[in-house]
Each structure stands twice: as structure tokens, then as C-alpha cells.
Amino acid sequence: MTIRHHVSDALLTAYAAGTLSEAFSLVVATHLSLCDECRARAGALDAVGGSLMEETAPVALSEGSLASVMAQLDRQIQRPAPARRADPRAPAPLADYVGRRLEDVRWRTLGGGVRQAILPTGGEAIARLLWIPGGQAVPDHGHRGLELTLVLQGAFRDETDRFGAGDIEIADQELEHTPVAERGLDCICLAATDAPLRFNSFLPKLVQPFFRI
């Protein structure tokens, strides 16, 4: 796997600081599980953060703080799940959300053979899986906020470049594009958005509220 499109420094910093929403954190974590370069960059940021923590003066804990933390840890301890065969298209950070196989996900048809599955993340940002048949285009659209799209299988092209497995596209309000899945292998992506897309055609606008896109 040759990855050419990586997570930005700003996103990595926010991820390391724990300020990203769950949906965006899921996309970044999944990319890091595939990309040695970005994983090394994230490790360097963690090291810097740890060094700063060591230089910070200690703060006295309130009475009962330790007991509270230990109680939370006890609640989080669960029996290990039985071993299961991993789907190579669903790296570890994503596997907890989708189960054993991507085919078993509850997909919803959007039209033109395109399917989506919204994942159970908290907060206002939405994470979804997209399954786009080879050769199929996603309707042209712009963005009202940030959109991260990570390719898990296949590839797509738009007005900016080609994105293959492991690549991540970062789109903002400046980008309008028409992603087209390459012919052959279906393109499966993990995407996250913090605002509805801005479609240019009437039909996508009409169904947009029902599909939360």
C-alpha cells in the first residue's frame, strides 16, 4: 500500500490533544493504523506533550479523586471478546464500529448503486461508510464544513487528484468536486463531516435530509 495523501499537522495536533470529535478521531485513528509516516508523526507529538506534562508543576488532587478514577476503570473492564477473523478493509480502530465484515454492516442505498452506513459516534459530527461501485460518480457537491474521506478499498478521482487505499482527502468550504470511483474494484471509504454537504443538483438536495448527508 503506497499512501500519498496524509493527515495535516493541524488535525494530528488536535487528535493528539484529544480535541477532535469522535467521528473525526475515528477517521484519523484508522488512517494512522495504515500509515507508518503519520503514525511516527503522531508519536512525536505525543512525546512533546509528555515532555510538557513533566515540566508542569504538580496539582493536588481533590479528596476521593483516586477512588473515583479506580471506580471508572472497574466499570470499563470487560471480558475479552472471542477471537474473530479481521476484515482487512476494516482496521482495528474501525472494527469496533462495524463488526466482523463490511458486508454485514446495515447498508442503506442512496441511489446509483451507492450505499452508506452511518456509524454510532457521539457529538454533532457524523461518521459513515460509503460503498461506491467501480465507475460510479458521487453527485457534485461543495462543503459547509470539514469533510475527511479515507479510502479503505479501491480508489476514486476528483478534480484534485487520485486517492487510493490508505489515502485521506481533506475537504473544506473551498472545495467543490465530483468524486468518481475507478472502474474495477468497488471503492469503500470511511468519511466524517461536521456539516451537511452542499449539493448542486436538485435530487440530492431533495433526499439529503433523509440520508443525513
UniProtKB/Swiss-Prot annotation:
The keyword Translocase does not apply. Residues 86-194 are annotated as: Required for response to singlet oxygen. Changing C38S: Loss of ability to bind zinc. Zn(2+) 2 binds at H141, H143, E147, H177. Its cofactor is Zn(2+). One of its GO terms (molecular function) is metal ion binding. Binds 2 Zn(2+) ion per subunit. The Zn(2+) bound by the N-terminus is required for anti-sigma function, the function of the Zn(2+) bound by the C-terminus is unknown. The keyword Mitochondrion does not apply. Changing C187S: No effect on zinc binding. Induction: Induced by singlet oxygen. Autoregulated. Part of the rpoE-chrR operon. Changing H5A: No effect on anti-sigma function. It comes from the Bacteria. Zn(2+) 1 binds at H6, H31, C35, C38. Disulfide bonds: none annotated. Residues 2-85 are annotated as: Sufficient to bind sigma factor and inhibit its activity. Changing C35S: Loss of function; no effect on zinc binding. InterPro entries: Anti-sigma_ChrR, Anti_sigma_zinc_sf, ChrR-like_cupin_dom, RmlC-like_jellyroll, RmlC_Cupin_sf, Znf_put. SUPFAM superfamilies: RmlC-like cupins (SSF51182). Keywords: Activator, DNA-binding, Metal-binding, Transcription, Transcription regulation, Zinc. Disruption phenotype: For single chrR mutant about 12-fold increase in rpoE-regulated genes. For double rpoE-chrR deletion mutant no effect on anaerobic photosynthetic growth. In illuminated aerobically growing cells double deletion is bacteriostatic. The N-terminal anti-sigma domain (residues 1-85) is necessary and sufficient to bind sigma-E and inhibit its activity. The C-terminal domain (residues 86-194) is required to respond to singlet oxygen. Anti-sigma factor that inhibits the activity of the extracytoplasmic function (ECF) sigma-E factor (RpoE), thereby indirectly regulating the transcription of the cycA and rpoE genes. ECF sigma factors are held in an inactive form by a cognate anti-sigma factor. Forms a 1:1 complex with cognate ECF RNA polymerase sigma factor RpoE; this inhibits the interaction of RpoE with the RNA polymerase catalytic core. Belongs to the zinc-associated anti-sigma factor (ZAS) superfamily. This is Anti-sigma-E factor ChrR. It comes from Cereibacter sphaeroides (strain ATCC 17023 / DSM 158 / JCM 6121 / CCUG 31486 / LMG 2827 / NBRC 12203 / NCIMB 8253 / ATH 2.4.1.). The lineage of its organism: Bacteria, Pseudomonadati, Pseudomonadota, Alphaproteobacteria, Rhodobacterales. The gene is chrR.
